[in-house]
């Protein structure tokens, strides 16, 4: 298994191909990767390290690359779930990013998971059912995640607030930051929503 590649960035491809090429000792490795990761890469020609997972198919070998071992390991768990192949695994990481994806699975937020292109309600349910316990154990130690998403409202209220804020045009990253910043005292859904909007309106 190829655990990671360290070399120089040669090329980046966007869109459906969504990949990067890394030159290691004169050999170029094409690695499929989430667009979120591609946006974080250094300029062409600069050194880069990519954490990889090799998928063996009947006619080809495909390397998938990520910015951290934790992101790679979550991808490996995602593609073990029935109905979730590498393409959907990348789509999930593109839609949410690592901390938000783990939070959505652990809190069984099926509606949020279903926002991923290609992920229907049943697939989202399977993700939550099969990965909830495993990812819950990882939340505190995920490498390169922002901060643990353990605060904020309880799961049932969080789902309602998140969906309402998404409908208002806020990003998942903005929403998670707002909910984490609010005091964790019990309050109705309407108050969580109001306080989150107030917090977000004050951000630059």
From Swiss-Prot:
Residue ranges of the region described as Flexible linker: 147-156
Region listing for Domain II, in residue ranges: 68-146
Gene3D superfamilies attached to this UniProt entry: 5' to 3' exonuclease, C-terminal subdomain (1.10.150.20), Nucleic acid-binding proteins (2.40.50.140)
Entries under Pfam families matching the protein: HHH_5, RuvA_C, RuvA_N
Single biological process term from Gene Ontology: DNA repair
Disulphide-bonded residues: none
InterPro entries: DNA_helicase_Holl-junc_RuvA_I, NA-bd_OB-fold, RuvA, RuvA_2-like, RuvA_C, RuvA_C_sf
Function statement: The RuvA-RuvB-RuvC complex processes Holliday junction (HJ) DNA during genetic recombination and DNA repair, while the RuvA-RuvB complex plays an important role in the rescue of blocked DNA replication forks via replication fork reversal (RFR). RuvA specifically binds to HJ cruciform DNA, conferring on it an open structure. The RuvB hexamer acts as an ATP-dependent pump, pulling dsDNA into and through the RuvAB complex. HJ branch migration allows RuvC to scan DNA until it finds its consensus sequence, where it cleaves and resolves the cruciform DNA.
Known partners and oligomeric status: Homotetramer. Forms an RuvA(8)-RuvB(12)-Holliday junction (HJ) complex. HJ DNA is sandwiched between 2 RuvA tetramers; dsDNA enters through RuvA and exits via RuvB. An RuvB hexamer assembles on each DNA strand where it exits the tetramer. Each RuvB hexamer is contacted by two RuvA subunits (via domain III) on 2 adjacent RuvB subunits; this complex drives branch migration. In the full resolvosome a probable DNA-RuvA(4)-RuvB(12)-RuvC(2) complex forms which resolves the HJ.
Family: Belongs to the RuvA family.
Protein name (database record): Holliday junction branch migration complex subunit RuvA
Organism encoding this protein: Synechococcus sp. (strain JA-3-3Ab) (Cyanobacteria bacterium Yellowstone A-Prime)
């Amino acid at each position: 298994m190829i655990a990671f590649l360290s070399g120089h960035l040669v090329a980046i491809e966007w869109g459906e191909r969504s990949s990067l090429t890394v030159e290691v000792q004169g050999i170029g490795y094409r690695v499929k990767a989430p667009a979120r990761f591609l946006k974080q890469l250094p300029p062409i020609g600069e050194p880069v390290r990519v954490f990889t997972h090799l998928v063996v198919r009947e006619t080809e070998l495909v390397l998938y690359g990520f910015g951290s071992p934790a992101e790679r390991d979550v991808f490996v768990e995602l593609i073990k779930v029935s109905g979730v192949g590498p393409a959907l695994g990348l789509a999930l990481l593109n839609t949410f990013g690592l901390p938000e994806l783990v939070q959505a699975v652990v809190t069984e937020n099926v509606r949020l998971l279903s926002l991923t292109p290609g992920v229907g309600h049943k697939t989202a349910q399977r993700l939550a059912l099969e990965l909830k316990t495993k990812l819950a154990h990882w939340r505190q130690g995920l490498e390169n995640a922002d901060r643990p998403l353990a605060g904020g409202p309880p799961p049932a209220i969080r789902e309602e607030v998140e969906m309402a804020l998404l409908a208002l045009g806020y990003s998942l990253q903005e929403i998670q930051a707002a909910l984490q910043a609010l005091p964790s005292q019990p309050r109705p859904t309407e108050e969580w929503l109001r306080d989150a909007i107030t917090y977000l309106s004050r951000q630059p």
